[in-house]
């Protein structure tokens, strides 16, 4: 059994935490995402508008970011694909339904109580202006 508990992009790598064969694992993965570019010949990939696109792999995550940036201002040339590479990694590594085992996942909840800001209501959590 294999499932993920957290996947993040850090720099040009995927930081992966999960459970494999009942053991917790952590890995730095040199992931190579796929992107898609317009194709004049029919392929098995199309855009949501029915236009054919071809699959390309520019390299690792940094290379993929550079590829997207290189073509972002080029007229009549679009680069398609998900640039949230952690989700691409999950889709590639865990296709279909993930077989989760809740007994293997550590779950915690932290709830703090804070005072009320002047004028009532709820404080802005990003500002941390109210005492705990």
Q: Which residues does each predicted region cover?
A:
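The two-metal-ion catalytic cores of nucleic-acid processing enzymes
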Residues: 1-130
């Amino acid at each position: 059994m294999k499932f993920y508990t957290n996947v993040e992009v850090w720099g040009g790598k995927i930081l992966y935490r999960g459970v494999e064969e009942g053991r917790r694992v952590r890995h730095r993965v040199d992931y190579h995402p796929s992107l898609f570019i317009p194709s004049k010949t029919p392929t098995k990939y199309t855009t949501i508008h029915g236009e054919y696109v071809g699959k390309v792999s520019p390299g690792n995550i940094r290379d993929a970011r550079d590829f997207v940036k290189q073509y972002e201002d080029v007229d009549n040339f679009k680069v398609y694909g998900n640039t949230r590479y952690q989700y691409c990694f999950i889709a590639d590594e865990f296709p279909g339904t993930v077989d989760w085992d809740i007994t293997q996942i550590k779950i915690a909840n932290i709830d703090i109580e804070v005072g009320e800001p002047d004028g009532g209501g709820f404080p802005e959590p990003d500002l941390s202006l109210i005492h705990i």
